[in-house]
Regions:
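Cytochrome P450
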Residues: 1-447
Length: 447
């Protein structure tokens, strides 16, 4: 295919209007890099019947910097009143700032050590063979959700399921996802079912942990005596008593007294605790599984990753992981809806007017291959400029827990790469869905 050919666009233009987006969706899912390259070169803003794709770095960053115009309105019916469903308003600014303070970046060395220990224990117990998605990629972040975020007292499999269906409905059940009506109803039903269970759990968690905080603070002797009776009753009923408060996110939030004017009461604490869970598990699992497969499929970079994984200094290894994610991101795009008419690429030959209510896909994977920003974009070059990656989003809706993810994701991959002769017999099985569901790995166990 020469530089002037338009293999994809020729088919797109020739297709019937009703068939155009199905073609686009198929190419995005099965051959994204050559498709996006052609768009960047020949039609960087592609208008389809369902949505508009933006493929240049400058256009992607422009729209993601305008949250009141390019909104997350499509999140709102799925997320309820969580801060990420709000666009540049008081609640979003206030709660994201509060939560970023709680997620103290000074914790990160300890968080990475925690992740490493969890990961090593799982791999050691596996003794050379593991189904990595369910027994590792999901299990490590689920354990961190309990131990660091403080969502204890629930089965890890429940935490995983609650995260899974929230993520599925919010990010993969949108107008530009090609699904049957039956499948859409199933996703919504499972989301509703798991959200009800999550809500009940969060309520119980808040009550239980608030009692512990109040007793710890010894606000009054009678309350401390009551809490002692509560523990005795649990013991007599055969229930495990809490061993005391640890330093985790839930404890930090409940230990902190906020003035009424800050509007961060126990209900808001609970909503934000649930948000930590939902955002942590499935995204991490997908990123880790896909990076592992990417490296196993490329002997040159596998060898370099395995060598770097042995070093205590992790910068070299982490750079390999982030560059791999450029090629296999958890999603090739973000999505927004316009609240007002806007011209993207104004003053250029690609200028396009987007009417109110347009669905817009800033194609972040394509932006990470834009030669205007990424030198030699088709080459695998670790240690690129971190700020040009979109692995945790961009702008006001950049991932709340990105700094946790920045140590958790590479450390999980690193522990796998430290295993002797790690290998896979098959590709990741997505089971016709958006997430990795099965991926069997083997290595030479020392046990």
């Amino acid at each position: 295919m020469n530089a002037n050919s338009t293999y994809y666009l020729a088919q797109f233009d020739a297709a019937a209007e009703a068939d155009k987006f199905a073609l686009v969706r198929r190419w995005m899912d099965t051959e994204p890099l050559p498709f996006f390259k052609e768009l960047r070169e020949h039609r960087p803003i592609l208008v389809t019947p369902q949505c508009t794709l933006l493929t240049r770095f400058d256009d992607v960053t422009e729209v993601l910097s305008l949250p009141k115009i390019f909104t997350v309105a499509l999140y709102a019916p799925k997320m309820g009143d969580y801060l990420m469903a709000h666009d540049d308003d008081a609640l979003h600014t206030r709660e994201k700032s509060l939560m970023q303070g709680m997620l103290n970046r000074n914790d990160l060395p300890a968080v990475r050590s925690m992740v490493a220990n969890i990961a090593r224990n799982l791999l050691d117990r596996a003794q050379g063979q593991i189904e990595i998605v369910n027994d590792y990629c999901r299990m490590v972040p689920a354990t961190l959700v309990q131990d660091y975020f403080g969502l204890d007292g629930a089965d890890k499999k429940d935490l995983i399921e609650w995260s899974y269906w929230n993520q599925y409905d919010t990010f993969h059940n949108q107008p530009f996802d090609i699904l049957s009506d039956e499948k859409r109803r199933l996703i919504v039903a499972r989301h509703d079912e798991t959200s009800a269970k999550l809500g009940k759990y969060i309520t119980e968690l808040m009550v239980r942990r608030l009692l512990m905080v109040k007793a710890e603070q010894a606000k009054n002797i009678l309350f401390s005596l009551w809490y002692g009776l509560h523990k005795l009753l649990r013991m007599l009923l055969g229930k495990q008593n809490d061993s005391g408060l640890k330093d985790d996110m839930v404890s930090r939030m409940l230990r902190t007294s906020f003035p009424d004017a800050v509007d961060f009461d126990i209900k808001r604490v609970g909503i934000n605790a649930g948000g930590l869970l939902i955002g942590a598990i499935e995204t991490t699992s997908q990123a880790v599984a896909q990076v592992i497969q990417y490296l196993l499929d490329r002997p040159e970079w596998l060898a370099k990753a395995k060598a770097a994984a042995q070093h205590d200094q992790t910068d070299e290894f982490d750079g390999i992981v982030w560059e791999a994610l450029r090629f296999v991101p958890i999603s090739p795009y973000l999505f927004r809806r316009t609240a007002s008419e806007y011209t993207v690429g104004k003053g250029t030959d690609r200028a396009t007017v987007l009417p109110v209510g347009s669905h817009v896909l800033p194609v972040t994977q394509s932006a990470m291959f834009d030669a205007q920003t990424f030198e030699s974009p088709d080459q695998f070059i670790p240690q690129r400029n971190w700020y040009h990656y979109f692995h945790f989003g961009f702008g006001s809706h950049e991932c709340l827990g990105r700094y946790v993810g920045m140590v958790m994701i590479p450390e999980m991959v690193r522990q796998v790469m430290r295993q002797q002769d790690v290998r896979s017999a098959t590709k990741i099985d997505f089971k016709s869905g958006p997430f990795p569901e099965r991926y069997d790995l083997y290595w030479n166990s020392m046990h």
